[in-house]
Amino acid sequence: MTTINQLVRKPRQATTYKSASPALDKCPQRRGVCTRVYTTTPKKPNSALRKVAKVRLTNQEEVISYIGGEGHNLQEHSVVLIRGGRVKDLPGVRYHTVRGSLDAAGVAKRRQGRSKYGAKRPKS
């Protein structure tokens, strides 16, 4: 327990909040232009070719964004919407692209969890 004298010398510090997605500037999503679309490999023990895009946001920040779902239509100069949310096995990837919005098409033939991939309801 600290003494009053110690608290007079150095007051208690309030814990500061550190954002997990600082490039969004406290916005829920942000628009950006793809500068490079490529695949990368995850950390051990996983193995795959994960689809990612380097995106220049409207606030001039460059971020790496994960493209979820099977298959995508993104290429350089595609305009995409970015949301927060990191990918645990890809270092440096702290954002997700929103499928079914702007130039990013929804996942074709998706039947379950459609809202996360921008897929329309199938005709029964």
Curated annotation (Swiss-Prot):
**Sequence segments annotated as region (Disordered):** 1-24
Annotated CDD domains: Ribosomal_S12
Keywords assigned: Methylation, Ribonucleoprotein, Ribosomal protein, RNA-binding, rRNA-binding, tRNA-binding
Offer an example of a GO molecular function term for this protein.
structural constituent of ribosome
Q: Name one GO biological process term.
A: translation
Q: Which residues carry this modification: 3-methylthioaspartic acid?
A: D89
Q: Check the record and name the SUPFAM superfamilies matching this protein.
A: Nucleic acid-binding proteins (SSF50249)
GO CC list: small ribosomal subunit
Q: How does it assemble?
A: Part of the 30S ribosomal subunit. Contacts proteins S8 and S17. May interact with IF1 in the 30S initiation complex.
Role noted for this protein: With S4 and S5 plays an important role in translational accuracy. Interacts with and stabilizes bases of the 16S rRNA that are involved in tRNA selection in the A site and with the mRNA backbone. Located at the interface of the 30S and 50S subunits, it traverses the body of the 30S subunit contacting proteins on the other side and probably holding the rRNA structure together. The combined cluster of proteins S8, S12 and S17 appears to hold together the shoulder and platform of the 30S subunit.
| HAMAP family to which the protein is assigned, alphabetical | Ribosomal_uS12_B (MF_00403_B)
| Family to which the UniProt record says this protein belongs | Belongs to the universal ribosomal protein uS12 family.
Q: What is this protein called?
A: Small ribosomal subunit protein uS12
